[in-house]
Amino acid sequence: MYKRQSLVFAEHLSNLIEELDDQEFIRFFDTVLEKYDIDEKALLRATNEYTKNKTQKNLEIISQLSEPGWRELFRRLNTISEGTLKLVRMRERIRSLKNDSNNLQFFDRSLLILFKYWFNPSFLVLESIDWTTPANILEKIIAYEAVHEINSWDDLRARLAPTDRKCFAFFHPLMPNEPLIFVEVALTNNMPDSISEVIKIDRPITQEQDINTAVFYSISNCQEGLSGISFGNFLIKNVAHKLKQENDGLDKFVTLSPMPGFSKWLDNKSCLLYTSPSPRD
């Protein structure tokens, strides 16, 4: 009975939080931190008691008092239907408002710590995305593509349907309809000269016996609420291993994906690039 009541309360609270306007949202987290943070006085008393009497029981009391009540609140919110997704969306909203509130900045960091446990790589599921993948997932691939915009369903089909094009995504078991990150791969004969060769709609398909190169040409993080958690390296390693198992002739792995921040850096250096004198022989 208590567990059921707890779930009902958590569901009700989650719905209330979603309905708050921005100022109410900020005030809610101010109140949570004020009422459910660590009881410093009780913790200090317990610490003093432990210094006098170093028992396992006293150490456990310190451990219990060191955990703030709001952390248990997040755990309970995580138990409701789609609770994990709702918490990810909650952190996304926190991040959008955190410049207006020091307490939201605190909860942004605190949720990140929890998420790093909940989204441990060992919990993630690698799935292949192709033209037969359900439409609701494909729509999100179009929306979340962050490197080379997908302009139409024909454009998407050209990236997913041919046998020499692959796409893989990580999912979390509690967010089965939400990709966390995905990578697009072209299987080619040697490295292509340009990205346009890779993503154009009408092109010849590389036959299986001619494939020797895997070109990772786009990788996109999908969830702003999981910002700060690195999935990319783990995804690429898993995909490279899987592709190698499926393609005996594959011996080169390259990337055409843009370097994050490179364009901004280049803009700042452009005047130097154009005005610097040519080096003398």
For every predicted segment, state its role.
Residues 257-270:
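Short, conserved secondary-structure transition motifs
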